[in-house]
């Protein structure tokens, strides 16, 4: 996984790929929390990066679903 995936790259994904990516990032976030609790985490900046990516994907997913509803 690249740390600097941009919204441009996310826009290329379809809705099922977006949902899969969200699930994967949430699992990564869970793993980071677990590592932090056991004091094994050295890269605390990863929290911010992953949370930002999840927010971008959720926003993109919502806007895609709204555009599909309005076109119907």
From Swiss-Prot:
InterPro entries: Ribosomal_protein_uL29, Ribosomal_uL29, Ribosomal_uL29_sf. Pfam families: Ribosomal_L29. GO terms for cellular component: cytosolic large ribosomal subunit. Keywords: Ribonucleoprotein, Ribosomal protein. GO terms for molecular function: structural constituent of ribosome. Transmembrane segments: none annotated. Coiled coil: none annotated. It comes from the Bacteria. GO terms for biological process: translation. Signal peptide: none annotated. Belongs to the universal ribosomal protein uL29 family. NCBIfam families: L29 (TIGR00012). This is Large ribosomal subunit protein uL29. It comes from Prochlorococcus marinus (strain MIT 9515).
């Amino acid at each position: 996984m690249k740390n600097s995936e941009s919204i441009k790259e996310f826009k290329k994904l379809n809705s099922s790929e977006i949902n899969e990516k969200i699930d994967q990032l949430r699992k990564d976030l869970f793993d980071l929390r677990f590592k932090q609790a056991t004091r094994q985490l050295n890269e605390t900046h990863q929290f911010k990066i992953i949370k930002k990516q999840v927010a971008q994907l959720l926003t993109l997913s919502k806007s895609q679903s709204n555009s599909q509803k309005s076109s119907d």
